[in-house]
Every structure is written in C-alpha cells, then in structure tokens.
A protein has these predicted regions:
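ATP-dependent phospho-/nucleotidyl transfer catalytic cores
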Residues: 14-90, 97-128, 182
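ATP/Mg2+ or Mg2+-diphosphate-binding catalytic cores
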Residues: 212-259
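Helix N-cap / loop-to-helix initiation motif
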Residues: 193-197
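Conserved kinase catalytic-core helix
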Residues: 1-17
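Catalytic activation segment of kinase domains across protein kinase-like and atypical kinase folds
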Residues: 136-162
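Conserved catalytic-loop position in the HRD/HxD motif
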Residues: 132
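Active-site activation/catalytic loop segments of kinase-like enzymes and analogous catalytic loops
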Residues: 159-192, 205-224
Length: 259
C-alpha cells in the first residue's frame, strides 16, 4: 500500500533544490564496483594476508562477476532513459526530461484513477521511494500498519524499496524460496510489477550488496585489526550461495525475457 500511496504524489519543482532527487541506480552500483576493486587491489598488494583477506581473495571473482552482470543488466533495461523531472505529473520520459503523471492522450480517462498507471515499457518508472525500508521501519498495530522514518525518501525505482526489505528478510531466513515467493505474491496483489521492474528486482538481488559492504568497511576501517565476525560474515555469504542461487534462478525465470 505504501508504494500505491506514494504514486499519487505529484512532483514539485522545488524538489530540485533538495535531496529528494538521486542519481541513477546503476551509477551507484558502479561506484560500489570501483570500491570493491580498490579493496581487492589493496589486499593483493599485501605480502602477508589475514584470514579475512584470504577469504576475500578466494571469493572475490565470483561476487565481482555478479556485480558486473547486475549493473549491465539494469543499464540495459532502460537504455538512454533520462531522470530529470518536470513539475506536476507522474513518470513520463520524453527523452529530454521526465514528467511525472499520466500520458496526455489518456488524461481524461485517468483523472479519476487512484493510482497512476504503469509507464510505457521503454520508460523508467520513477516514483517516490522510502529509501531505507526494512523490518525496523514497519510498526504493526492492532488495526493498522505504519511505515516510519522517511529521511531517505527520494525519487527513484520503487522496486529498490521492495528489494531492500526482502533482502534483509531472506538473509535472516537462509534464502527460503517459499518465503521469498510469498512476499512477492503479497506485493503484487496490491501493486503488480511490470516485466522490466521484475527484471530490475532480479538484478538488484544478483548484486552482492552485503559482500560489497564488508569490503568497503574493511578498506575504510583499521586494517591492522579485523574483527573475527567480519570473516564469519564472508564465510556465511559463501555458505548461503546455493540457496541464494536457487532464489535467483526462480526470480529470473519469472522475468519474461527481460534478463
């Protein structure tokens, strides 16, 4: 329901002056790729390596290949899409700017619609996103559910919210396939995904975000002392690969030719 409600909010020109606009998703992931390379290159330059560093060397290529494929895949979903918004409407990419709102030719028929229609297949579907959605931001009441902390709200692809929420849950439950499919089904009963949105979700799950986080934390922290739990986290990622790959395989099969 959160995303359905956010899709009703029209873009305002004054947002251009704030942090509600963010760069393309693929550019953020490309930056993460460079950070992984930087950490790996540093580790390779060391003559004596710690247990954590040996784990990185042993698993790096597998995860980095996933990262490259994910970035390229997201970029190819909406090639050349511009993310500059115009005031007053919902996602509509003209090629020069993005207008948020229904298409002009359908305006009369859609004026009474509660939720704006999905954008055309070659347009990037940009709407307001929570930006940091996980289980800690969901409050369950006796007769209501509330979402809190919107300090990272931005204009972007709403599927990224779904990914963040699901990834945390899936990691905690060993990438349980039935659980993942149940969450996807619950989401789509309220807001069905377009094929390219499902493809984007697949590539976001393919991207090794937790692996990147471990390498980036290592590179920016005190490398003389690495907590044992960091090494355990890397090993845990490797141990979960089989279950994670099964979930990715099923997700990819449902992408209807978009990946």
């Amino acid at each position: 329901m959160l995303h359905s409600q956010l899709r009703k909010i029209e873009f305002k020109e004054e947002w251009n002056m704030g942090s509600i606009l963010s760069g393309p998703l693929e550019e953020e992931l490309e930056r993460h790729n460079r950070e992984m390379q930087r950490a790996r290159n540093y580790i390779r330059s060391k003559r004596k390596k710690t247990e954590f560093e040996l784990c990185v060397i042993g698993s790096y290529q597998m995860f980095y290949d996933q990262a490259l494929e994910a970035v390229q895949g997201i970029r190819e979903l909406w090639p050349g899409a511009d993310e500059l918004p115009s005031e007053g409407t919902g996602p509509y990419n003209t090629g020069k700017c993005l207008k948020l709102g229904p298409y002009q030719e359908d305006q009369d028929a859609l004026e009474a619609a509660e939720v704006q229609p999905p954008v055309k297949k070659d347009r990037k579907p940009l709407y307001l996103c929570h930006g940091d959605l996980d289980q800690h931001h969901v409050l369950m009441g006796g007769s209501y559910t509330a979402i809190i902390e919107y300090n990272r709200m931005h204009l972007g692809i709403q599927i990224s919210d779904l990914y963040r929420f699901m990834r945390k849950v899936m990691e905690k439950h060993g990438w349980n396939l039935d659980l993942g499919l149940s969450m996807l089904d619950s989401y789509e009963r309220v807001l069905p995904m377009e094929p390219k949105e499902r493809g984007c979700l697949y590539y976001l799950f393919l991207y090794p975000e937790k692996y990147w986080k471990q390498l980036n934390f290592y590179y920016n922290a005190n490398k003389a002392w690495i907590p044992a739990r960091n090494t355990d986290k890397l090993r845990g990622l490797e141990e979960q690969q089989q279950a994670r790959n099964s979930f990715l395989k099923r997700l990819k099969a449902d992408c209807k030719g978009c990946v």
